[in-house]
């Protein structure tokens, strides 16, 4: 049977003009109260795309007031039928489909994503996610409980209230949709702070939210820096929940701020150093490709990157050879250009961090198989890099690199590799490649990770809960559990004259 044909990918928009650079509050566009703006950089060219209004605490306060007003008892949003909330989310998905090429172009230009990926993956996944959450809107319900005594008892799942949502730069559109979709389906109101590197798709989505017909104040977007706008959200006394995707270091600060303020609910999806284990009986071609994509996709800028690759001793040399051969096939350049398969890192800081970790690998004795340096003279590009003979104590084996760098380590036994795989403060994801069903179940059960992929990698789905163990965070996004993260569970017990079964 032949595989289905890939859908046609249109050309990106030429000379895209950025329409929305202001703060979005109450369905209106505002200048920052401090009068400041910040530059948004194209990471492939290092040129300024535009300047965006820089929100800080005062702007967050303004957005919170709007969101709180929209959440008041008796407001249009609170009295709206749940099914109508779903209709609004579906309308937003339709508008995204209409403007899909524009969104993909913007995501590629601002976030450095390969345009084909931005069109076929980022926008497609986002549209499907919105439709998924739309379907949940009128299916969030409680239970009746046969409690003791002459009492009628039931539970209600109610929206938490005003939610702060802090978006990372590595998936600005997808994470925007994952967060607002779950929150809005339950009836919450939101203040979104996109990453300062990548605010453009969030601001454009704000215009579509208004066009779709969401009431004023339901969705507010405040671009700004983490140390100001992000900190204001985390510590705000009138925000009921904060959801953050980003580094473990910042996640700790957010949880601390939530605890020191009003003990707001917190969902964190943080860093990872995910193990990928390849046993000798695995389908070698498939394992090489999945492991490769697991660490090189989007220039390695993915939280679930398969950044600790454990390969069984008997196939190690051949696996390394094939991995190097695969890494050398990349064509680097502007991600908007056709034929390009690797784009830039997000900014100068991340670029320097990756190169520093590559140098540490060389100095600590890992064998550099290919790559190992900067590519080109302009843009934040890093050569696809593969290290072999990596040991567990090396920095490249312990620290999150967030770049196109593959570390390949050797193991001898199942007990050894499980112990080594779990020897990390992180626990976001893991991969296992084997044809032995018993081994697959044994290893996947033993791994301390929120998601374990068997004979595949990066197969995320909006229907499935996603989140981390240990220092990779707490709470879940997507799936039924991801929806319930945006609800409070209330028990109501009524005294009645007589209870009958």
Curated annotation (Swiss-Prot):
Phosphoprotein in keyword set: yes
Name of this protein: Aldehyde dehydrogenase, cytosolic 1
Site (Transition state stabilizer): 170
Record function comment: Can oxidize benzaldehyde, propionaldehyde and acetaldehyde. No detectable activity with retinal.
Organism listed in the record: Rattus norvegicus (Rat)
N6-acetyllysine PTM sites in chain numbering: 91, 128, 252, 353, 367, 410, 419, 435, 495
Keyword line: Acetylation, Cytoplasm, NAD, Oxidoreductase, Phosphoprotein
Lineage: Eukaryota, Metazoa, Chordata, Craniata, Vertebrata
Pathways per UniProt: Alcohol metabolism; ethanol degradation; acetate from ethanol: step 2/2
